[in-house]
């Protein structure tokens, strides 16, 4: 095979790999089929001191806390579930819109990652993951989705 033909083959191979790499950058892993835990499971999570569990809950805002501005900024508030259990919600406002009109007494629905602590726990990752490595979370307040 002549040198120009070999060179042309190499160019096509490199071009093919470049296309594969480009197309692969659009690949998103299949969503995990593990259903999230729900408020009915929260007592079990607390009892077993489990953490890093995706959970979806509904509750009433009982207290608005000051924002945590150390590192990534987080809006914080406490919700009470129908069972009486309270959870701290930690919402990253560098990655998701702030919920400006939230008030004590408002109903919210939250999907995020539960972390156990001795006060009942907290939910964070209530936002999208720009790197697509973690399940996207959200907060629904007054028919608006914050993620």
Predicted regions and their residues:
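OB-fold and OB-like single-stranded nucleic-acid-recognition modules
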Residues: 4-147
């Amino acid at each position: 095979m002549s040198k120009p033909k070999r060179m042309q083959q190499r160019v096509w191979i490199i071009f093919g790999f470049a296309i594969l790499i480009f197309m692969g950058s659009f690949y998103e892993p299949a969503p995990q089929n593990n259903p999230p835990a729900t408020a009915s499971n929260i007592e079990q999570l607390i009892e077993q001191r489990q953490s890093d569990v995706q959970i979806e809950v509904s509750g009433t805002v009982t207290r608005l806390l000051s924002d945590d501005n150390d590192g990534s900024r987080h809006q914080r508030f406490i919700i009470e579930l129908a069972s009486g259990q309270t959870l701290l919600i930690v919402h990253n406002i560098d990655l998701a819109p702030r919920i400006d009109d939230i008030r004590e007494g408002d109903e919210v629905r939250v999907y995020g990652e539960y972390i156990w602590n001795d006060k009942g726990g907290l939910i964070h990752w209530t936002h999208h993951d720009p790197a697509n490595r973690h399940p996207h979370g959200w907060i629904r307040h007054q028919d608006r989705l914050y993620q």
